[in-house]
């Protein structure tokens, strides 16, 4: 196996109850769209994100009102909370005091060394990690002057400069991101960064666009980076409801076999042989399995030609055939059901498989 497939030598960093890096699975993040000082709205949005599989959530902290709301938000959510800080070191101190699980800063734009040191000492005292967020669109003047324009080399140099600031203060609970809206630039930057240091990498294609175009752009960029074995946590950035970010992120990870707690749908392309309402059924099943946290592969096939043989790798599935459905497990037909009830029958089988998975998981955990 190519040594680049799995980057397991990253330094493990604790973020709340999650470990980022090491040999741990990638985690999915998002960011709220609400005004952080509006606690009710922010908590409600985070709860929606939790329901669809968000594992870490970031909130903007642009002012004191936002910083003062962090403690109340933290108490009412169930996933690690990250505060996004720019320029004002006092907001970082307030966020740390409020009990956030991570802060995102650029040490270089916080101010004088004594201010950075105050933030680092506060984070160190509470075991709170710091994410260094490098962005191609906001590189330091000295980097742009040196390279002429945003380059992968410049982004990595910026990251290393910020890392050195923290390391000089004996701080090593660091996560790094190197985001760009240019997919090729992001891929190159993350590849170079993965070879330059062993801190965990937070992946993202920034300013990727709307739900449709941005989802495709993010999948293309993140997929290329993941195929190199790079990445420990990620966010799909969309101009859309953040719930959609989680949906895209989950599908990207599932496509690479990097998510052990998500169901996957296989459905055949439409053609003249289809004998059931495939599009409606596939969408209904996809919505049904969206919140199932078990690694079940589900197939929905439009005719007997494509199934069940061509989807034998699926755990469970249906294939339409003349007003009825062939229900199958691992390529073997288990029974025929009328088309009118075949989706409900499929859902029952999915629930059975999920329950079996959770029972086995519980048994294994009890043996540890």
From Swiss-Prot:
Keywords: 4Fe-4S, Iron, Iron-sulfur, Isoprene biosynthesis, Metal-binding, Oxidoreductase. Belongs to the IspG family. It catalyses: (2E)-4-hydroxy-3-methylbut-2-enyl diphosphate + oxidized [flavodoxin] + H2O + 2 H(+) = 2-C-methyl-D-erythritol 2,4-cyclic diphosphate + reduced [flavodoxin]. Pathway: Isoprenoid biosynthesis; isopentenyl diphosphate biosynthesis via DXP pathway; isopentenyl diphosphate from 1-deoxy-D-xylulose 5-phosphate: step 5/6. Coiled coil: none annotated. Its EC number is 1.17.7.3. Pfam families: GcpE (PF04551). It comes from the Bacteria. Converts 2C-methyl-D-erythritol 2,4-cyclodiphosphate (ME-2,4cPP) into 1-hydroxy-2-methyl-2-(E)-butenyl 4-diphosphate. Gene3D superfamilies: Dihydropteroate synthase-like, Sulfite Reductase Hemoprotein, domain 1. Its cofactor is [4Fe-4S] cluster. One of its GO terms (molecular function) is 4-hydroxy-3-methylbut-2-enyl-diphosphate synthase activity (flavodoxin). This is 4-hydroxy-3-methylbut-2-en-1-yl diphosphate synthase (flavodoxin). [4Fe-4S] cluster binds at residues 268, 271, 303, 310. InterPro entries: Dihydropteroate_synth-like_sf, IspG_bac, IspG_bac-typ, NO2/SO3_Rdtase_4Fe4S_sf. It comes from Listeria monocytogenes serotype 4b (strain CLIP80459). Binds 1 [4Fe-4S] cluster. One of its GO terms (biological process) is isopentenyl diphosphate biosynthetic process, methylerythritol 4-phosphate pathway. It is an enzyme of class 1 (oxidoreductase).
């Amino acid at each position: 196996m190519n040594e680049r497939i799995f980057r397991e030598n990253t330094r493990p960093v604790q973020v709340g109850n999650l470990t980022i890096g090491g040999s741990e699975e990638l985690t999915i993040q998002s960011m709220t769209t609400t005004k952080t000082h509006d606690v009710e709205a922010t908590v409600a949005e985070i709860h929606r994100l939790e329901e669809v599989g968000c594992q870490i959530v970031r909130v903007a902290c642009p002012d004191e009102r936002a910083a003062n709301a962090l403690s109340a938000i933290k108490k009412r959510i169930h996933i690690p909370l990250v505060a996004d800080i720019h320029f004002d070191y006092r907001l970082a101190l307030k966020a740390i005091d409020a009990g956030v699980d991570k802060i995102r800063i650029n040490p270089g734009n916080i101010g004088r060394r004594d201010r950075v040191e105050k933030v680092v000492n506060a984070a160190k005292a509470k075991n709170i990690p710091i994410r260094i967020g490098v962005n191609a669109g906001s590189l330091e003047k000295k980097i742009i002057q040196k390279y002429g324009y945003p380059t992968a080399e410049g982004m990595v140099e910026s990251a290393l400069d910020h890392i050195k600031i923290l390391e000089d203060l004996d701080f090593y609970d660091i996560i790094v991101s190197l985001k760009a809206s240019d997919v090729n630039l992001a891929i190159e930057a993350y590849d170079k960064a993965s070879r330059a240091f062993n801190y965990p990498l937070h992946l993202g294609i920034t300013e990727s666009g709307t739900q449709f175009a941005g989802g495709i752009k993010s999948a293309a960029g993140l997929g290329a980076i993941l195929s190199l074995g790079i990445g420990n946590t990620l966010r799909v950035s969309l101009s859309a409801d953040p719930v959609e970010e989680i949906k895209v992120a989950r599908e990207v990870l599932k496509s690479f076999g990097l998510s052990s707690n998500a169901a996957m749908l296989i459905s055949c392309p439409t053609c003249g042989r289809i004998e059931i309402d495939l599009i409606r059924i596939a969408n209904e099943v996809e919505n049904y399995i969206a919140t199932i946290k078990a690694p079940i592969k589900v197939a929905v096939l439009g005719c007997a030609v494509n199934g069940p043989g061509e989807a034998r790798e699926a755990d469970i599935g249906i294939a339409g055939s003349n007003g009825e459905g062939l229900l199958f497990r691992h390529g073997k037909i288990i029974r025929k059901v009328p088309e009118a009830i075949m989706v409900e029958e499929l859902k029952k089988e999915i629930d059975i498989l999920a329950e079996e998975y959770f029972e086995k998981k519980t048994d294994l955990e009890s043996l540890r």
